[in-house]
């Protein structure tokens, strides 16, 4: 959205903690953004912008800085498509316009709604810049090669083909990968780090925060492979780091400064310690705080080093690709625009 890492734009997860107030809050409010979006900059230069997201939690971030009173911007979610208005989204009566009802949030249909809307917007609204954000529900539930997963990608491929017919530059990428994180019996494979630290030290000496946390618990039950730990007593950092290193299947344990400089994270939105689990393991806080009732399939999740690699697919031959530099998903618009020139 910004062409920059989270150390610049400030959004470093779904969820973060403010030690000053003791609040744990979702990062879906534009006030947490520290950089303008590419969409805002193009809009201000006179371009037409179309943004469609599956989950409504992203909509206000995507549409930040846009105005919807001059018919140059459209921004809505599939999840709340029936609530879109001209004043707030640049479009109304979305479901009638698209000929599709509001999809179930935990379904393939949520992403198909986004893709179908993208095709129709490209044909009718003709934006200069368009961003389509699907949901990872299917990827959380079904491994590659599964019949349901194959059906999803056949649907996705169909719409990419329709978009490609419109003589546009397309980049397909992802925010993260996905790995199986369950035991042989199908139950989640998790280290409940808050419980561990409460027993190892005094209770509540440490505060474990999981940035993957969001309201969509059916996806992953807030179990991912990344955690950050806040300590009231900063003199205990080394002893807590050493204690976490003793845990089998925790493969990265870094201080705040080490972790933020290594992974381009904003230090003031990270705890005193950053850790990541191994490939097939997740990190939880306290076992009794996780709602796992929606995990009807074996857990698949993300957040660690093993889910960093993502696809980066262009429908055009990329010009001036600098192979000496690491390519990131936030480079998508640079190369999409490069391909359009």
Labelled PLM ranges:
Residues 177-228:
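Acidic/histidine-rich catalytic neighborhood
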